[in-house]
Amino acid sequence: MRVAVLGAGAVGARIARQLLSGTSVTQIILRDTDADRLAQVSKSLGDRVIIEHAPFNSQLDAEVIVVATPSGTQMSTVLEAIEHRRPVISTSDSLAETVGILKFSKQAEENNTPVILGTGFAPGLTCVLASHGVAWFDKVEEIHISKVGTGGPSCALVHHRALSRISYDWRHDNWARRPGGSGRSLCWFPEPIGPQDCYRAALASPVLLHHAFPEVSWITARVSATLRDRLTAPLPMLSPPHSEGGLGAVRVEIH
């Protein structure tokens, strides 16, 4: 199988390495618009990878497309993949982008094109854990997601902006709108993370979980934040995020 990975950042580079660890993928096309980033990443990849310094939306010769460009830039590529009937995987954790892509679910179904959303940390791992937990119970009424940490610079930027935007919780057959940065909740994560104050934010997890579990009456998601995080959320980031993201954890609570 020939797979195209668009984006050679912290997430895209790791996706490429993970795909190389198996035998089902015969070739990977790793594409990015940043030549320096591609040169750095290519040093740790083998001869099954073709490095392309090209625009993301230009023609691709691949059976499956993995879109690992920064959140907020993925929608046009996903729609192009649907149009050309190519299976596509999106790593976006942007609420607006996730909702936008979901609007084309009917077109994807008509084109018989698989489109996979929520493939990161949260949403992604949290959705898998929620699905696993739901299977243990006869009936589930609540799912609550909490997250600490980011996967890289673009993920950190989404996290930063989300704290200043409207959050959406699913509650009793309606979407409840609440200000980002509100709703403090002390959440306990595995060590070495430990307890963290978590707050509402514009997160995609409730939307995807509602689509997966429409019978659940209350679905929420929160992210960890300090006082400075909440106060500076409407402003540009004051300091550059760590290139590798650092430690992180997720918590999935089911009732």
Summary of predicted features, one role per range:
Residues 19:
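Aromatic pocket-lining residues of Rossmann-like dinucleotide-binding sites
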Residues 3-7:
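Conserved N-terminal Rossmann-fold NAD(P)-binding element of oxidoreductases
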Residues 92-115:
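Rossmann-fold NAD(P)-binding glycine/threonine-rich loop
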Residues 135-255:
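C-terminal catalytic/substrate-binding lobe primarily of soluble NAD(P)-dependent oxidoreductases
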Residues 12-13, 74:
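N-terminal Rossmann-fold NAD(P) dinucleotide-binding loop
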Residues 24-42:
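NAD(P)-binding Rossmann-fold cofactor-contacting core
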Residues 62-83, 95-97:
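Beta-loop-alpha module in the N-terminal Rossmann-like domain of NAD(P)-dependent dehydrogenases
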Residues 50-61:
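Short acidic low-complexity segments
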